[in-house]
Amino acid sequence: MNKDDDKEGLAMFSALIDGIKPITQDKRHFRTPLKTKQEIALKEQQLHANSYFSDTYQPLLPIQGPMRWLDDGVDSLELKRLRRGDYQPDLLLDLHGYRQSEAKLELVALIQACVKQQSQCCCVMHGYGSGILKQQVPMWLVQHPMVKAFHQAPKEWGGDAALLVLIDLGELPHRR
């Protein structure tokens, strides 16, 4: 191609676009919507739940007999009291129908509510069978620093389908 062809092509192009105006920007630019306080609180709660509970951690829990666990430094008599039903749970959590991620959040919320209300014992109902929650809930409870012990609940509180959980309230006055 030479300069004459370029000039002819440029002239033809100019003739074709003669009378066309450039488009003006008439579109609105939208910012990303700001998160609500509820969304921020939920995200924060999820972060706390994920920092407490790992799905890959496998604690040493009993294979035979009732599900039970006792933290180091806690009197073994506490486990016996849980088994006998000496502790009456003040708060109940029913996890039937929950997904794992939702169950983790609810479990953290239950433990926080126990501390806030100075409730030393709570009941977590995970359901019968060999479902995911029945396997995961004890593993999650072992990982939480506020949990002192748990034991399979007596019949009146759910039996095989529930756990009684003993919460560490620190130096706060305990209720029984």
Swiss-Prot record:
Ranges where the Smr domain occurs: 93-168
Pfam families named among the record's database cross-references: Smr (PF01713)
Claim: Nuclease is one of the keywords in the record: yes
UniProt keyword annotations, A-Z: Endonuclease, Hydrolase, Nuclease, RNA-binding, rRNA-binding
GO terms under biological process: rescue of stalled ribosome
Annotated SUPFAM superfamilies: SMR domain-like
Signal peptide as annotated in the record: none
EC number: 3.1.-.-
Record-linked InterPro entries: Smr_dom (IPR002625), Smr_dom_sf (IPR036063), SmrB-like (IPR022990)
Keyword RNA-binding: yes
Alphabetized PROSITE patterns for the sequence: SMR
GO MF, one example: rRNA binding
PANTHER family for this protein: DNA ENDONUCLEASE SMRA-RELATED, UPF0115 PROTEIN YFCN
Similarity comment: family membership: Belongs to the SmrB family.
Quaternary structure, from the entry: Associates with collided ribosomes, but not with correctly translating polysomes.
Function as written in the Swiss-Prot or TrEMBL entry: Acts as a ribosome collision sensor. Detects stalled/collided disomes (pairs of ribosomes where the leading ribosome is stalled and a second ribosome has collided with it) and endonucleolytically cleaves mRNA at the 5' boundary of the stalled ribosome. Stalled/collided disomes form a new interface (primarily via the 30S subunits) that binds SmrB. Cleaved mRNA becomes available for tmRNA ligation, leading to ribosomal subunit dissociation and rescue of stalled ribosomes.
Protein name: Ribosome rescue factor SmrB
